[in-house]
């Protein structure tokens, strides 16, 4: 038996986040931003607080509070008991518009993201032109002692962890764990 849980995108424009579960497999279809929810709480220059973003998004009902789904550095920093093993096998991205993929940067980097080559290139462009992290997850809360003996926050490529992005060919059938994907 297969279950589908809608965590967004119902009676709304965007925010698509559907969890498809079978006996042995859990796959998210998209992980996007709801335009109405985002506009209700945020603006162009006001977003979730950087050091408390997951809690903000949980409290506002924008992201589902699912243990093991989110990046370990965020979960640990925000005292969210979510840094254990994940039960989600993958994210299947239908296409790389923000209403389908905007919250991928919050996901654990070891959860594979299945997408078309075109979507991968669009997400790569998001990385290169903004501060989002679709292809790599840069650890946000890692500190170290610098060569002056001062405490610094690690940044840039030093703390980048590549995501597992798997390419599928548009229009072709494929298997994602025990789920068969077809047109």
Label every model-predicted segment.
Residues 8-10:
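Short Gly/Pro-enriched turn/cap motifs at secondary-structure boundaries
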Residues 4, 30, 95-96:
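Divalent metal-coordination and catalytic microenvironments
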Residues 112-120:
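Short internal beta-strands
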Residues 15-20:
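Short beta-strand scaffold segments in enzyme catalytic cores
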Residues 129-167:
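Active-site neighborhood of divalent metal-dependent phosphoester bond hydrolases
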Residues 84-110:
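Di-metal (Zn2+ and/or Mg2+/Mn2+) metal-binding site signature of metallo-dependent hydrolases
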Residues 25-92, 119, 124-140, 144-145:
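Pre-active-site segment of Zn-dependent metallo-hydrolases
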Residues 179-183:
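Conserved small/polar residues in nucleotide/adenosyl-binding loops
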